């Protein structure tokens, strides 16, 4: 037993005092922060031009051509939309420049942001997927490749190790969306749903490992998105069209079984993020509920200014969902709608700027960030872009 005034008791009291101070200090820092930059990883949902930068100039991908980028930028930028993406609206909210792509950039300034997200990227390594008969032509840039590019580029981005750690500590690190293409490519080669489900824990472990590595490098705040409700995807609604009406949600017209798959991914990802949060209490790990942020637009399209056919693509080529497999937006045989701001879906796979703006608002101002961001030390909110031509 320790008695009053004894050295053991004094040491115990000092330890308790310091422990309380440390916990309090960490908690106050993670409530509201002024981010100095954005570091982004992921796929086409966050790609601001990386796939374009990696492409052969003689064989450019379809999003390198109009009508991609026609609103806001007024020319293609390598983004898979008619305008800005969620990451762009986050940057605007934080008062930061739009995050430049890393790959193919020349003399770009990455001091306030750098983006490694590549259209078509997977969480798992290409060789791992190909060994399981899952082949894809788009890119060999996995999450691991992106992370390695980031580590190798640090001396040129931020200089000394101490400066780099400071940059990473004060950055909002956007981890995706990533993993959706792992599932997409498996569906595209007709893998069964049970076999595709086996990829889920592997995808989530890969995301978790990347977050853990970035925490070791100084990462303090992570925004980790879940998947879209793929049962509402124009591509999947077209490729998995069925006469069995019981497979469709009567309110939205989305495929219930595919949406359940997306929900399962989100549940497993959130459980893993909760585990990481307990392991690293000094870090702020925020789940971005892309699933419900987008699904809400399908549930009540008129409320958000969309037309009453939200499952129809703006840039498409006929059919019940204005989408034909193999006929891509950005080619001469596909036309764009007159007013993309009235559409949720852009090209059958990706969303319009109008949809992305609303999703960003739901993440930044609630209710689709878990736990929610605390902006009490800030005076500004998401800027309403109004017209997508502004």
UniProtKB/Swiss-Prot annotation:
Residues 1-28 form the signal peptide. InterPro entries: GDSL (IPR001087), SGNH_hydro_sf (IPR036514), SGNH_plant_lipase-like (IPR035669). GO terms for biological process: lipid catabolic process. The keyword Iron does not apply. CDD domains: SGNH_plant_lipase_like. The active site is at 44 (nucleophile), 347, 350. It is found in: Secreted. The keyword Signal applies. PANTHER family: SINAPINE ESTERASE, ZINC FINGER FYVE DOMAIN CONTAINING PROTEIN. Belongs to the 'GDSL' lipolytic enzyme family. This is GDSL esterase/lipase At1g28580. The lineage of its organism: Eukaryota, Viridiplantae, Streptophyta, Embryophyta, Tracheophyta.
């Amino acid at each position: 037993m320790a008695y009053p005034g004894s050295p053991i008791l004094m040491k115990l009291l000092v330890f308790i005092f310091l422990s309380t101070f440390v916990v309090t200090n960490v908690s106050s820092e993670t409530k509201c922060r002024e981010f100095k930059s954005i570091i982004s990883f992921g796929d086409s949902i966050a790609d601001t031009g990386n796939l374009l930068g990696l492409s052969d100039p003689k064989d450019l991908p379809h999003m390198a051509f109009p009508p991609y980028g026609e609103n806001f930028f007024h020319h293609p930028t390598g983004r898979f939309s008619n305008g800005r993406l969620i990451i762009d609206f986050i940057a605007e909210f934080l008062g930061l420049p739009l995050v430049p792509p890393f790959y193919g950039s020349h003399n770009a300034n990455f001091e306030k942001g750098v983006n490694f997200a590549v259209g078509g990227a997977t969480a798992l390594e290409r060789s791992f997927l190909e060994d399981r008969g899952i082949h894809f032509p788009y890119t060999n840039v996995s999450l691991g490749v992106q992370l390695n590019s980031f580590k190798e580029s640090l001396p040129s981005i931020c200089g000394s190790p101490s400066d780099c750690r400071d940059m990473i500590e004060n950055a909002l690190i956007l981890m995706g969306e990533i993993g959706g293409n792992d599932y997409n490519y498996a569906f595209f080669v007709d893998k069964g749903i049970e076999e595709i489900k086996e990829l889920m824990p592997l995808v989530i472990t890969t995301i978790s490992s990347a977050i853990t590595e970035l925490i070791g490098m100084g990462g303090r705040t992570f925004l980790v998105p879940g998947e879209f409700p793929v049962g509402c995807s124009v591509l999947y609604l077209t490729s998995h069209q069925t006469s069995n009406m019981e497979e469709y949600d009567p309110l939205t017209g989305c495929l219930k079984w595919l949406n359940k798959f997306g929900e399962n991914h989100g549940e497993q990802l959130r459980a893993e993020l909760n585990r990481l949060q307990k392991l690293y209490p000094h870090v702020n790990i925020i789940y971005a509920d892309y699933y419900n942020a987008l699904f809400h637009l399908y549930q009540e399209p008129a409320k958000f200014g969309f037309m009453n056919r939200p499952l129809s693509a703006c840039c498409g080529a006929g059919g019940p969902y204005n989408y034909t497999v193999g006929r891509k937006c950005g080619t001469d045989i596909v036309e764009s709608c007159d007013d993309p701001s009235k559409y949720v879906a852009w090209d059958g796979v990706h969303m319009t700027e109008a949809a992305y703006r609303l999703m960003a608002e739901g993440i930044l101002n609630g209710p689709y960030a878990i736990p929610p961001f605390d902006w009490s030390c800030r005076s500004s909110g998401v800027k309403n872009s109004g017209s997508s031509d502004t």
